[in-house]
Amino acid sequence: MPFQAKRRALLRSVPAASLMLTGLGAASIARAHQDGAAAAAAAAVARTARPDPWQRAADIVARFATPLAFRKEDFVITAHGAKPCTLVRIKGQTESLVEGMLDTPAPGSPDCYPAIAAAIAACHAKGGGRVVIPKGEWYCAGPIVLRSNVHVHLAAGARVHFSANPTHYAQHGEHDCGKNGKLVLSRWQGNDCLNYSPMVYAINQTNIALTGEDWTSILNGQGGVPFEPGFAEGPECWWDWKGRGKPVRTRTEVVANPNNPPLDKVVPGIDARRQASIEGEGDRWQTDSRYLPALSEAGVPVEKRVFGHGHFLRPCMIELIGCDKVLLEGYQVNAAPFWLHHPVACRDLLIRRVNMESLGPNSDGFDPEACDGVLVDDCLFNNGDDCIAIKSGKNLDTGHGPTRNVVIRNCVMNSGHGGVTLGSEMAGGIEHVYAEKLEFRNIHWKNDPLNTAIRLKTNMNRGGFLRHLYVRDVTLPHGVATEPMLYKPLPGAREIREPVASTAGAIITIDCDYVPGDDTMRIRPPQVSDIEISNVRTTNVDTGKGSFSCYQAFVLLGPVASSYNGKPGAAIPPIARVRISDSDFGTPRNTAKPWFLHNAVDITLDNVTIAGKRYQQTLSRIGLSFIRSGQFVNIFYLA
C-alpha cells in the first residue's frame, strides 16, 4: 500500500487509548522486584549463555554486500539546458546566530532545476541510469526528486546551491493545498504532514542513489543565507524560523500562529476535556512546532495537517520516505535548513563516506526513522545538533513500527549535541542498534563541547521502547562537556532532589524524562532495557579548573512517575539490564557522585575505571512507584 494511503488508514483506525500501556498495581510491582539480587544473578547467567549479539550486526552488514546496479547510460544535466552560475560574497549566518561572509549564487543566476528534473525524467523513462551534475557552481530553485533506478551523481567540484526561497519548495509537490502551496508528504519531528519539499526528496522509490566523487561534491542548503527578494514571510533566513535571538512576536515556529485554529474547529465533536488536555494552558499549542503534534494526538488525518506557506516548519535537506535499496555516498552537505538526512520507513539504506557539515539549529546529521536495515559507515559529522539521532515517530504516528537493525561504524563525530542519539521521537520503538569503532572527537571542546557521546532521550509523551543497543570500541580524546546542563523536572516533582546532568555533561546518558514540560499529554511510560557498552576510552582535558573528561561518567534517569498524567494504574518500568564493561571514563568533575541512577535495575559495571578507581559491581536504584487514583505514590527506593 502506498505510504500516504497507509498513513490515512492508520490515523483513522487507531484511537489514542490504544497506545496506553496496561497498568500494574503496587503489589504487582513490589512482587516483580522482591528479589533484585536473584534477578541480577539470573540475568548474568543468561548473558553468559546467549549467543554473541554482534553476529546480528554482521548479518545486517551482509545485506549490503551486493552493490546497487544501474543501467550504463549517463544523462548529463548540461544536455538538458543547465548552465553554471557565478558566486558573490554576502553577509549571512555561518552558523546559528553567528554572522559572517558567505558565497551564494549571484542575483539572476540561471536555474538548473528544470534541467535536473528533465534529466531524471529521461533517465527514469529509459529504465534508469546515471544523472550527472558536472564540475561547477549550480543554482537550483527547486527540489531534486529521485526516482526508481536513477543514480544522481555529483562530479568532483560540483556544488549545488539550493535557492534561499521557500516558495521554490512549495510549487512542485503533488498535493495542491491552495494558498499554502503545492506541498509534499513529509514528516517533521516524528509527525506526518504536508509541507515544503526537502531539497532532495523521494517517496516510494526503489534502487536509488545519490553520490559524489569526493567531498568537493557539495549540496548546499543555504540555511543561513538571507531569503531572496520577494519572499516576505517571517524572518530573514531558514535558520531564523527556529526563533532563536528574535524579538518575542517575530513569526517563527515557536510563536502562536493565527493560521492554526483550535482543535474543535478541526475535529468537530472532540471531547472538551480531551481538547484541553492536548492543547494545555495558554497559546503554546498554537505554535507550528506544537500544533502538528497536537493534530497527531487528536487523530487528525495527514491530508488535513497542511503547513507550507503561512507556517514555519523548515524542511529537511534530504528526505526519503518509503524507499528501499538506497545508496548515499561520497558527498558533502552544508548549511541545511533543518535535519540533513531523514529517511522514513526505508529499508536497506547505506550511507557511506558522507561529510555532514552544518551548524544551524536542528542540524542533525543523520536521522533514520522507522527504518529497517541501515548501515552508517565511514562518515564525518560536524553538526549544530545531534550527529546521529535514531527515531520512530511521535504521538499516534507509529504505523511504520520501530527502527531496527542499524549498524554505525568507523565514524568521526567532530562536534554536536549528542554523538549517537536515540530519540526523542521514538514512540514506535527502537531495537537492535549496533555502534562500533567511533571517535567522538569533540574538536570544539573549549567553547562548544559535545554534550554527551551516547544518548537516549524520551519521556512520558514520546514513550516507545529501546532494547538491544550494543556499543563498543569508542574513543573520546577530548571528553565531553565538563559543565553540566541540568534536568528540569516538572514543578512539584518530588522524586529527584539533586542536580542531574541529563542534558549535557555525561558520557553515557539515558534520559527517560527528557524536557517533560514540553508536552501536555504524558501518558506513555517508555521501556528501556538490554544495553551493552564496552571499551569506552576517554581522555581528560585541561579546563583551567582541573583536568577532567566530563561532569559525570553516566546518567541513567529512568521514567519519573510524577511526570505521568494518564489513566491511573499504569506501571512505571525501570531501565533494566545495562552492562558497561572494560571502559575508562577519565576523571569526572563531579568526583563525589561520578554517576547518577534513578529507577534503574541490574546495572552492571564490569572492569570500569572512573577517576582511576576500578568498579566491579551491580547497581540498582528503583523507586517502586505507581499511580493510584490519579496521585503519584512512591513506596521506597531499592538501592
What residue spans do the PLM features occupy?
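Short glycine/acidic-rich loop motifs that flank beta-strands on beta-rich extracellular proteins
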Residues: 128, 141-142, 163-165, 222-225, ...
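Right-handed parallel beta-helix
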Residues: 156-157, 206-217, 324-334, 347-358, ...
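C-terminal/domain-terminus segments
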Residues: 219-240, 349, 353, 550-569
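Extracellular beta-rich repeat passengers
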Residues: 445-639
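Exposed loop/turn and edge beta-strand positions of beta-sandwich/beta-sheet ligand-binding modules
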Residues: 314, 322, 345, 362, ...
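Short, T/G/N/S-enriched strand-turn elements that build extracellular solenoid repeat scaffolds
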Residues: 120-122, 140-147, 339-345, 378, ...
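Extracellular "leader-to-stem" segments immediately downstream of a signal peptide or signal-anchor
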Residues: 2, 9-151, 155-322, 329, ...
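Asp-box/BNR beta-propeller blade signature and adjacent active/binding-site loops
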Residues: 79, 85, 93, 110-113, ...
